[in-house]
Amino acid sequence: MGLRHLVLCPGSRSGPLALAAGGMARTNRLRLSTAIDERSAAFLALGFSTATGTAAAVVTTSGTAVANLLPAAVEADRSCQPLLLLTADRPYRLKDCGANQTVNQETFLSPACRWIGQGPREGLHLFSKETLESFAEKAWQRAHHPAGAVHLNLPFEEPLHLSEEEQRMIWKGWSPKIPRSSPIKPINLAMAAEGTNGVTDQAPFALDPLRPGVVIAGAWRGLSKDLFAFQQSLREWQALSGWPVLADPLSALPSDQPGLIRSWELLLATGLLGSQEQLQVLRLGPMSASRSLEAWLKSFGDGQLLITEGDSRCLDPLGLSVQWNHGLTSWWQHHHHRWIDADAASQQATKALLRKWQISDRFAQEWLDQQLPLQGAITEPALARWLSRLLPTELPIMLAASSPVRDWLAYADKSLFSRRCFSFRGASGIDGTLSLSMGLAMALGPTLLVSGDLALLHDSNGWLLAHPQRPPLVVVLIDNGGGGIFEQLLVKTAPSEAFEQLFAMPQEVDPLALAGAHNIPHRQVACLEDLPAALEWGLFQAGPVLIRVCTHRRQDSSMRQQLREGLMMHLQSISQNGHIDL
């Protein structure tokens, strides 16, 4: 069917699946990883799926092992990434009678899955070879159209463990055929949603490239195979319209995308470019983590166009858009013939709009370079600015949810778009941050993870995945003594001591000692000047490494506010001197 990577968790009831996976791995038909923590295993597989656009699989035994798959299933559902969850189960005769390790696991994952495939109640051995092939084919298609998690719950009757000779006989006779049936019709995710506000399958909504507008590119939620066509369609639309492109670091747009504006989040936060002129809005994918953007979009009212890459659920929390779910490439194919001879980008109003954004962006980037030099104490804004510059071109980056992804949105420079960036912007959790990054590194090669201390500690079992595969992952740990994101969310309803206890929750754990306990090479960086050498050291290692930097979350929170206010005054001064018309 196309399965290339499987993560196996320990268990007895799943013994037949383990033996089959081992046999396929020995004949190089499958890449096999092992993990003792099912939650970590599922995120490892999800990382591989996210990197390749093709589903990886997880195998678990019965019982609570299945419940641990739910966080990854939720993230796969919301980020639209394929994932196969194979769980062994007891036969039906052992259900609801107090049998050991027997629960109603067939229902555990259903809210987050594209499809639940239930094997024969008395045991998978009752499936014929043809039925099993059809069952597997359907699961594979459901995991990819539209992409998400599929759960196969597979009862096994004893005996569970065959001899090696019996296993060989099975493997010799196993020769899966190319899928015979026509593709399964994709399910409509919106049918299961609580509402379909603004979602349409009618003729796609048309924008007018002869009038000014703006493109808002959120996180990419399509499959890897569709990315180039998406990028090319946007390039052609921008060449026609001349609109500025406000892109999220997770948008998967290249650094040479015409009209790309890097500092848009900070510029919107100043309020100087948030004019009330009526602009058309083309939104691609989900909303970025920016309240300034939300407020700005609200000022334009309804009639905005939101295009998703196959996700038919409503993705507009603002309720202002018409939503087209069949992808930018499909939308562009519907409309490009209308404007073959148009020269919309030469329209004076559009040219003035793009020029204002580009000049403001250039001044903002130059000002940030002055404010965030590569020297002195380490701050989170400075890390976001410099890490991408110091890394090899095209090296992928995984950004933990909460502070890192927001800082890179605001402070990273244009070099960020020379590489793919990943993050949890589906369900926006911190589950599995390290484990998913391990999966990315296994699939893509050298990769960098930027994580806070709580996110890394929450998934510390991910360090167990370092051996024996040794994925080339450099982990930059921002240790600010707790949940730094809450300093930014203006939680001021509690005194300082209560804030630390109820929100920040600092942990008394030495992350370097924890890494050392897992035989992970580690290093502490004391100042920004030492960062280049530390990154060079980390990338030179053969497997995962930890680079720890310590920051002060309260001071960094104040610094972010000072940067926003300072940029506003800087741009106002430039405008008064006639260098830019705001």
Swiss-Prot record:
Pfam families: TPP_enzyme_C (PF02775), TPP_enzyme_N (PF02776). One of its GO terms (molecular function) is 2-succinyl-5-enolpyruvyl-6-hydroxy-3-cyclohexene-1-carboxylic-acid synthase activity. Homodimer. Binds 1 thiamine pyrophosphate per subunit. It comes from the Bacteria. This is 2-succinyl-5-enolpyruvyl-6-hydroxy-3-cyclohexene-1-carboxylate synthase. Its cofactor is Mg(2+); Mn(2+); thiamine diphosphate. The keyword Metal-binding applies. It catalyses: isochorismate + 2-oxoglutarate + H(+) = 5-enolpyruvoyl-6-hydroxy-2-succinyl-cyclohex-3-ene-1-carboxylate + CO2. Belongs to the TPP enzyme family. MenD subfamily. Gene3D superfamilies: 3.40.50.970, TPP-binding domain. Pathway: Quinol/quinone metabolism; 1,4-dihydroxy-2-naphthoate biosynthesis; 1,4-dihydroxy-2-naphthoate from chorismate: step 2/7; Cofactor biosynthesis; phylloquinone biosynthesis. Its EC number is 2.2.1.9. The keyword Disulfide bond does not apply. GO terms for biological process: menaquinone biosynthetic process; phylloquinone biosynthetic process. Catalyzes the thiamine diphosphate-dependent decarboxylation of 2-oxoglutarate and the subsequent addition of the resulting succinic semialdehyde-thiamine pyrophosphate anion to isochorismate to yield 2-succinyl-5-enolpyruvyl-6-hydroxy-3-cyclohexene-1-carboxylate (SEPHCHC). It is an enzyme of class 2 (transferase).
